[in-house]
Amino acid sequence: MDLDPDIYEGIKEYSEKGETLFYDGRFSEALREYNKAYDMIPEPKQQWEASVWLIAAIGDCHFWLKDYAASLECFRKLMVEYEEYGNPFTRLRYGECLYETGNEQLAKEHLLVAYSMEGEELFEECDKKYLSIISIFKLQG
């Protein structure tokens, strides 16, 4: 099933604005645009592919705004409700947010899975501490 063309165009417009703002480092403004796009998706939102990438974009904005709890909820939603276990980026951000909210052991597990899926290049734009967490974890076994 496809989205209504008018709804799709609205989602696309807000998403493109959000993406431009995001890449300009204007994360709060990008978050507003992504939320507008997400709000346009009809219920049940889980049936629409656009929900997945918008939740990821919203979670990514929260991450860069250092609102790790809100970001964690977005990526938890992707993992649980949308079954995005096979998405390396989802695993990476989920692991980073778990770490930042104090759940280091579970964070290590998800970061290691992300690493095993995509390798070190997935971590290139991340704080180096996340890659070092995996190194320590690999040594500890």
Task: Identify the meaning behind each predicted range.
Residues 37-41, 72-80, 115-118:
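Amphipathic alpha-helical segments of tetratricopeptide repeats
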Residues 38, 99-122:
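TPR/TPR-like (Sel1-like) alpha-helical repeat modules
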Residues 1-5, 41-48, 79-83, 121:
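Flexible helix-coil transition and linker loops at the boundaries of alpha-helical arrays
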